[in-house]
Amino acid sequence: MRLWGLLPFLVPFILLWSIQEPELAEGFFIRTCPRVRVKCEVEERNECTRHRQCPNKKRCCLFSCGKKCMDLRQDVCSLPQDPGPCLAYLPRWWYNQETDLCTEFIYGGCQGNPNNFPSEGICTVVCKKKQMSSWI
C-alpha cells in the first residue's frame, strides 16, 4: 500500500530520467555555484558581490580565485578561450576540450569568460576533475 503513495512522486523523476535532451530538464533542477576549492597565490578582483549585480540570470559565484558572474547552465571547461577586449598582459590558462589540456594564453584583464585560470594547476584541478566525474 505504501508504495502506491510514492507513485505520484516517482513518475516525474522516471520521466525526467528518460529525457534524451538534457536541456529539456533544466527547469526542474536548481543549479548551484561550482564547489571547487583551490589554493590561490593571488586573489583576483571580484566581478560581483551579490547575484543581483550579474546580468541575464547569471549568479555571483566564488570560482577560481575570485567572485565571477556565471551562467550555471554552461560548462565552464567547454567555453572557448576569450582574452577579453582590454589591453593588459596577463598570462592565464584555459582548458581546451579538443586537446584535453590546459593551455596558456594572454588575458586582457577584463570581461572574457570563466574558462580563465591563474595557473595551470588550478585549471587542471577544475577541468580534469570535472571531466573525470562525468565518466563515473
Swiss-Prot record:
Q: What is its main location?
A: secreted
GO cellular-component terms in the record?
Answer: extracellular region
What would be an example GO MF term here? serine-type endopeptidase inhibitor activity
Keywords tagged on the record: Disulfide bond, Protease inhibitor, Secreted, Serine protease inhibitor, Signal
Under the heading Pfam families, the entry gives:
Kunitz_BPTI (PF00014), WAP (PF00095)
Q: Signal sequence span per UniProt?
A: 1-27
Could you tell me which SUPFAM superfamilies the record lists for this protein?
A: BPTI-like, Elafin-like
PROSITE patterns recorded: BPTI_KUNITZ_1, BPTI_KUNITZ_2, WAP
Q: Does the keyword Signal apply?
A: yes
Q: Where in the cell is it found?
A: Secreted
Residues covered by the BPTI/Kunitz inhibitor domain: 77-127
Cystine crosslinks: 33-61, 40-65, 48-60, 54-69, 77-127, 86-110, 102-123
Boundaries of every WAP domain copy: 28-73
What is the name listed in the Swiss-Prot or TrEMBL entry for this protein? WAP four-disulfide core domain protein 6A
Q: Which organism is it from?
A: Mus musculus
